[in-house]
Amino acid sequence: MGVNLRELIPPEARREVELRALSGYVLALDAYNMLYQFLTAIRQPDGTPLLDREGRVTSHLSGLFYRTINLVEEGIKPVYVFDGKPPEMKSREVEERLRRKAEAEARYRRAVEAGEVEEARKYAMMAARLTSDMVEESKELLDAMGMPWVQAPAEGEAQAAYMARKGDAWATGSQDYDSLLFGSPRLVRNLAITGRRKLPGRDQYVEIKPEIIELEPLLSKLGITREQLIAVGILLGTDYNPGGVRGYGPKTALRLVKSLGDPMKVLASVPRGEYDPDYLRKVYEYFLNPPVTDDYKIEFRKPDQDKVREILVERHDFNPERVERALERLGKAYREKLRGRQSRLDMWFG
């Protein structure tokens, strides 16, 4: 779920763009975040995910395949970063997510029995699960498509932020804001699904475009440092301290941090209750120094079309004609947008 910084981000630090504005940039994408979005959004009207003849879920593969092609056709260079072992501090959040999914599954079944299609779809989306088999097959598909991916030792967003700080990527891509706390110079949101999107439970659509958020303009406008932003995030609540510190919203958290200045003083001021200040200091240190790796190579290779056909058509019953048309697009995008092309290094703002 991540930290919610949306209310604090000033207009000066964010802007909506068309996909083509990101052409030439390497983007380190939070793979789990993207795959969950595909599993949630790519469903039939009753909420059922896409399935092959054996009943295996394929929504994630469909989203990954076609969306990646859309990105590279625009000249974007996606690098998918996969989560490793979650830190022990995240166990409470993981357990809570499992509980919520189990509850959503039960409500989904009741809605189906009652013939409530809209309710069934809503709860089916909430119950989406990403299994280890899905993750491994996603990596296999990316290999076949010639797309690079990186295995993070722990949090994918931390690894993606590290790659962006090093200059190996221009920005991180995720719906969550955590990568800003991890120090990513830029965050791009709304990459998995763009265009018109129906609001859940309402007969209303909104236009979704990619959104760029830059860390330095954000910090400058708020008048704080990255370390202080981490303290704000902890007060609001992160995956490592769900719910945050009682009584603090975005404005009150920012006010306290600016008043006390030193993040250690901020965390020490928290009343001993649900979260001990010593524990919160560990969370703070994790955002500053998460486990990351330099064991990766960003290389875009010629697609192995036969392997893609094997995975999608032979194994998972994808429509062969549609896959062939997509492979033609992928091959053309590789030749014209990826092969031998240098990445853009210029800054977006400024």
From Swiss-Prot:
Mg(2+) 1 binds at D30, D83, E155, E157. Mg(2+) 2 binds at D176, D178, D239. Binds 2 magnesium ions per subunit. They probably participate in the reaction catalyzed by the enzyme. May bind an additional third magnesium ion after substrate binding. Signal peptide: none annotated. The keyword Magnesium applies. Its EC number is 3.1.-.-. Its cofactor is Mg(2+). The keyword Phosphoprotein does not apply. Keywords: DNA damage, DNA repair, DNA replication, Endonuclease, Exonuclease, Hydrolase, Magnesium, Metal-binding, Nuclease. GO terms for biological process: DNA repair; DNA replication, removal of RNA primer. Residues 119-261 are annotated as: I-domain. Residues 1-101 are annotated as: N-domain. It is an enzyme of class 3 (hydrolase). InterPro entries: 5-3_exonuclease_C_sf, Flap_endonuc, Flap_endonuc_arc, HhH2, PIN-like_dom_sf, XPG-I_dom, XPG/Rad2, XPG_CS. PANTHER family: FLAP ENDONUCLEASE 1, FLAP ENDONUCLEASE FAMILY MEMBER. Structure-specific nuclease with 5'-flap endonuclease and 5'-3' exonuclease activities involved in DNA replication and repair. During DNA replication, cleaves the 5'-overhanging flap structure that is generated by displacement synthesis when DNA polymerase encounters the 5'-end of a downstream Okazaki fragment. Binds the unpaired 3'-DNA end and kinks the DNA to facilitate 5' cleavage specificity. Cleaves one nucleotide into the double-stranded DNA from the junction in flap DNA, leaving a nick for ligation. Also involved in the base excision repair (BER) pathway. Belongs to the XPG/RAD2 endonuclease family. FEN1 subfamily. This is Flap endonuclease 1. The lineage of its organism: Archaea, Thermoproteota, Thermoprotei, Desulfurococcales, Desulfurococcaceae.
